[in-house]
A protein has these predicted regions:
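Short alpha-helical linear motifs
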Residues: 57-62, 123-127, 185-188
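"A position-specific structural signal for the A-helix of alpha-solenoid helical repeats
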Residues: 19, 77-84, 126-129, 133, ...
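Structural signature of alpha-solenoid helical repeat junctions
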Residues: 70-73, 77, 97, 101, ...
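Extended alpha-helical scaffolding segments
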Residues: 145-198
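N-terminal alpha-helical interaction modules that lie
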Residues: 1-92, 99-115, 159-165, 171, ...
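Alpha-helical adaptor scaffolds
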Residues: 107-155, 169
């Protein structure tokens, strides 16, 4: 199957799954919604939810990469479906155990967008929504770093910067995070000014960010 045909097939399948899951959630049919997601995982990713819940993302990634064809779309489907699973569980969960699904969704979106720059823009908001959901919780600094990089890939540069300064506040201006921030701004300085403006972080604000990091370093 040609790549564009495969992409369209995955997109159409995801559209139908989103529509059906949203309907089931609205009707409070959570078990049916979970089964729809599980069938989607088997069809689009080749794994069921039981396997995904047990395996680390590293192991899942190794399985997906074995076929070495159209992997970015499999990662995209994984991200979308894990985000849906988080949404289903969050509606009735009394704790935050469902956050693990959003963490897996983040991993999926990160891999998808890092491997394929031509993913349909309509999935950008799905990835952004996952980042926003995770930002509600106190998570590891490694997850924060991944959120920053995903925002950067999606050209949501203002959100990436917000994440950076959240990390600085969280770590009391840890030197390694300041260095991470300097690398972030230096990458942005290489972008066209129009791209920076589209990302809601104009060149002047990039320079302001560098100056602020230098101030925190005592330079």
């Amino acid at each position: 199957m040609l790549k564009n045909d495969y992409k369209k097939e995955v997109e159409n399948s995801l559209d139908l799954i989103y529509e059906e899951v949203d309907k089931r959630i609205a009707d409070k049919e959570d078990d049916e919604a979970k089964e729809i997601v599980n069938k989607g995982l088997k069809s689009l990713v080749g794994l069921d939810i039981g396997t995904i819940e047990v395996f680390s993302f590293h192991s899942i990634s190794e399985i997906i990469d074995r076929e070495n064809q159209y992997n970015s779309m499999k990662y995209l489907a994984f991200g979308c479906l894990m985000s849906l699973m988080g949404k289903i569980y969050s509606k009735k969960s009394e704790d935050t155990s469902y956050v693990i699904y959003y963490e897996k969704a983040l991993d999926g979106f990160y891999k998808a967008f890092s491997e394929d720059e031509e993913i349909n823009e309509k999935y950008t908001e799905d990835a952004v929504d996952t980042c926003k959901e995770l930002s509600k919780y106190e998570l590891s600094i490694e997850i924060d770093k991944k959120i920053l990089r995903l925002y950067e890939m999606l050209n949501k540069l203002d959100k990436a910067e917000d994440t950076l300064f959240y990390m600085l506040q969280k770590t009391d201006n840890d030197g390694s995070i300041i260095l991470e921030g300097m690398k972030f701004y230096n990458r942005l300085k290489k972008k066209e000014k129009e791209v920076l403006s589209e990302g809601n972080l104009p060149f002047e604000e990039v320079e302001d960010g560098i100056a602020e990091l230098e101030r925190r370093m005592g330079i």
